[in-house]
């Protein structure tokens, strides 16, 4: 069972816009006092994550879909269970029983993405990812090390961090099943416009099917829907209005979550951590505002991060692995080894690939053309020195580092880089009844922290008296 330590994530509201460096820490300490006094705001504390979980629970009602996660069991063992049950279901009947209609979004080389919208409540939306099994590539369709199944296992394992309110920055799965591939070959006319060039991938999928490249069944994954698209698309559309604070918070959300995962699973590698494999959720104005802040805790370290109206969620784990826990036949293939996609522990790899692809001209050409604040350019150069940037002999054409070096880690970056300096605070805070830190904190704590008495700022030393 995992030792949770003090890794927690929650939020609060500030009443003024004074100097943020001082005010963030005061608000944090004040909020912790209110939590341990069991303030009346506790009833609202869980709303953002509780709402996510409640939405997912409701997806099972009235249908035949089996839940992937037991949201009421927070133990590590529950999420580590290797068993993934994929019943053979009729997709049309299932979605009818769930009361949703499917809207086609896009296709990839081996599958499709749909948006499932509730017929009774248009605000209830899910994502449906359909993956075909290429024949003879990675073994039988029930193999746990096939990339299609690895992705599902990884989503289940990593959902531990969301359910236990350690980070919100991961997509939660709902359920998975097998269905006949022909359900997605003979999609009704009008659902997909085959004359539209953006749907060429779907036509290639059909061609591959008729060439006999796919197995008879497809894997269907139902998960949370993120309303902001992928991060790369979001940046391309909004970079001209993204402030230094916005960039800093987005980067922090990613690096904090990687550091958190590495703490429990040091050998975790996403292996395809680029901006278009990260999704964006535009947050509800009721829970987000200019004076909203979030407290992130990692061990004995605390960060106070302002709300920016969006939250990223890491996604797309078909290249991922955790050596000794989640084996991936795609990662072990000869072609991936040649480009340094590996299961070997390296906490720098994913972070490097994210930034080195982001700054490339094929991804975001505006990066070096005034599209980001200079502070962000300087930050990326500190994380990705010239010898590990595009154009170096150490990098392949698609931005992957070819040498096995752990130049730095996400944890080291959030702890030492000046970009995050004003957001870093000591974890040691004062318990109102006992001279010790409380063992539990609450995700998304709501309230006006400044209304509580604010003790002197912590210097990191053990207090000599109760407050």
From Swiss-Prot:
It is found in: Virion. Pfam families: PK_Tyr_Ser-Thr (PF07714). One of its GO terms (cellular component) is virion component. Residues 458-467 have a biased composition (Polar residues). ATP binds at residues 105-113, 129. Keywords: ATP-binding, Kinase, Nucleotide-binding, Serine/threonine-protein kinase, Transferase, Virion. The active site is at 272 (proton acceptor). It catalyses: L-seryl-[protein] + ATP = O-phospho-L-seryl-[protein] + ADP + H(+); L-threonyl-[protein] + ATP = O-phospho-L-threonyl-[protein] + ADP + H(+). One of its GO terms (molecular function) is protein serine/threonine kinase activity. Its EC number is 2.7.11.1. Residues 443-467 are annotated as: Disordered. This is Putative serine/threonine-protein kinase R400. GO terms for biological process: regulation of autophagy. It comes from Acanthamoeba polyphaga mimivirus (APMV). It comes from the Viruses. Belongs to the protein kinase superfamily. Ser/Thr protein kinase family. Residues 99-467 form the Protein kinase domain.
């Amino acid at each position: 069972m995992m030792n949770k330590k003090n890794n927690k994530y929650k939020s609060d509201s500030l009443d003024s816009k004074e100097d943020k460096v001082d005010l963030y820490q005061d608000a944090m300490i004040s909020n912790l006092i209110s939590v341990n006094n069991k303030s009346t705001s506790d009833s609202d504390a869980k709303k953002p994550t509780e709402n996510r979980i409640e939405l997912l629970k409701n997806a099972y009602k009235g249908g035949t879909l089996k839940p992937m996660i037991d949201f009421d069991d927070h133990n590590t063992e529950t999420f580590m269970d290797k068993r993934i049950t994929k019943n053979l279901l009729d997709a049309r009947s299932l979605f009818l029983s769930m009361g949703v209609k499917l809207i086609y979004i896009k296709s990839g080389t081996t599958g499709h993405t749909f948006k499932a919208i509730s017929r009774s409540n248009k605000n209830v939306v899910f994502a449906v990812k359909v993956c075909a099994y290429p024949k003879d590539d990675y073994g039988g369709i029930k193999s746990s090390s096939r990339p299609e199944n690895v992705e599902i296992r990884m989503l289940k394992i990593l959902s531990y961090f969301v359910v236990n309110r350690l980070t919100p920055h991961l997509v939660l799965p709902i359920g998975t099943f097998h269905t006949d591939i022909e359900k997605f070959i003979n999609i009704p006319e009008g659902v997909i416009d085959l004359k539209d060039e953006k749907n060429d991938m779907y036509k290639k999928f059909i061609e591959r099917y008729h060439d006999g490249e796919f197995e008879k069944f497809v894997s269907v994954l139902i998960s949370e829907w993120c309303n902001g698209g992928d991060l790369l698309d979001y940046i391309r559309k909004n970079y001209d209005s993204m402030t230094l604070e916005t960039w800093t918070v987005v980067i922090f959300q990613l690096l904090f979550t990687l550091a958190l995962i590495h703490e429990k699973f040091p050998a975790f590698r996403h292996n395809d951590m680029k901006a278009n494999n990260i999704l964006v959720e535009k947050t509800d104005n009721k829970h987000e505002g200019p004076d909203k802040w979030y407290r992130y805790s990692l061990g004995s370290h605390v960060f106070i991060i302002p709300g920016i109206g969006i939250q990223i969620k890491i996604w797309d784990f078909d290249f991922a692995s955790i050596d000794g826990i989640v084996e991936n036949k795609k990662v072990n293939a000869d072609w991936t080894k040649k480009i340094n996609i590996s299961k070997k522990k390296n906490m720098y790899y994913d972070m490097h690939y994210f930034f080195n692809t982001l700054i490339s001209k094929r991804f975001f050409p505006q990066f070096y053309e005034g599209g980001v604040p200079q502070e962000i350019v300087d930050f990326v150069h500190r994380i990705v020195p010239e010898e590990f940037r595009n154009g170096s002999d150490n990098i392949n054409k698609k931005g992957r580092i070819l040498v096995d070096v752990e130049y730095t880690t996400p944890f080291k970056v959030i702890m030492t880089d000046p970009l995050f300096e004003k957001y870093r605070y000591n974890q040691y805070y004062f318990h109102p009844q006992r001279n010790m830190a409380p063992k539990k904190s609450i995700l998304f704590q709501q309230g006006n922290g400044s209304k509580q008495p604010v003790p002197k700022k912590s210097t990191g030393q053990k207090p000599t008296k109760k407050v």
